[in-house]
């Protein structure tokens, strides 16, 4: 089976808790290789553009404000069924509904400050990866 790529963002709340290493360990234990990574402080323009699909939703402004509230860790994960596998280990969007042992159950505080973002489809993964990384930044692992 071909390996997929997916985008993951460790959000400002989880970065502030210093759990990046613990989250990376979960990716690797699930068979997801990190093939690109960077820490950055998103600008308002970047966050608005990245989450443009949600622009008409009532939570858009709060989402953007949260995503620019502190640094984020952005990584590209590679592995078999990477999109689905990453979403499984992230857990439900609302941490109160997330299964025990998932990233959100263990590290998220609320549906807004929910620790991580993960691509929800191969198509969105390709778009999201291209938003943050140039092709030459992806390492072959």
From Swiss-Prot:
Locations listed in the record: Cytoplasm
InterPro entries: NDK-like_dom, NDK-like_dom_sf, Nucleoside_diP_kinase, Nucleoside_diP_kinase_AS
Single Gene Ontology BP annotation: UTP biosynthetic process
Enzyme kind, highest EC tier: transferase
Co-factor requirement: Mg(2+)
Pfam families: NDK
Record keyword Glycoprotein present: no
Transmembrane intervals: none
UniProt entry tagged with the keyword Phosphoprotein: yes
The protein's name: Nucleoside diphosphate kinase
Species this protein is from: Legionella pneumophila subsp. pneumophila (strain Philadelphia 1 / ATCC 33152 / DSM 7513)
Lineage of producing organism: Bacteria, Pseudomonadati, Pseudomonadota, Gammaproteobacteria, Legionellales
